């Protein structure tokens, strides 16, 4: 009997740095509702993602997927490039 893989998180964000080899920095926008006032509060988080072929560049809108730890700070990998930078 084959084991099924657990659900993996998928996020969308913009590439803010591609200066590292096989690694990109992606800025994710988090939207949360304030518990008392109900206002939607936007905040950002920057994560590092694995880009095996160095195909993503600064400004690209990308989809990243959660994966096993690849290094001290990398826990995401590039899933697809949704839109290229203009």
UniProtKB/Swiss-Prot annotation:
Gene3D superfamilies: Nucleic acid-binding proteins. Keywords: Ribonucleoprotein, Ribosomal protein, RNA-binding, rRNA-binding. InterPro entries: NA-bd_OB-fold, Ribosomal_uS17, Ribosomal_uS17_bact/chlr, Ribosomal_uS17_CS. The keyword rRNA-binding applies. CDD domains: Ribosomal_uS17. Part of the 30S ribosomal subunit. One of the primary rRNA binding proteins, it binds specifically to the 5'-end of 16S ribosomal RNA. Belongs to the universal ribosomal protein uS17 family. This is Small ribosomal subunit protein uS17. It comes from Bifidobacterium animalis subsp. lactis (strain AD011).
């Amino acid at each position: 009997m084959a084991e099924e893989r657990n659900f993996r998180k998928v996020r969308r964000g913009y590439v803010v740095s591609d200066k590292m080899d096989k690694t990109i920095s992606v800025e994710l926008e988090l939207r949360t509702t304030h518990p008392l006032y109900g206002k939607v509060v936007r905040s950002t988080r920057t994560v590092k993602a694995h880009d095996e072929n160095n195909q993503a560049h600064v400004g690209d809108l990308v989809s990243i997927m959660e994966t096993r730890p690849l290094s001290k700070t990398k826990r995401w990998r590039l899933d697809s490039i949704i839109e290229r930078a203009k």
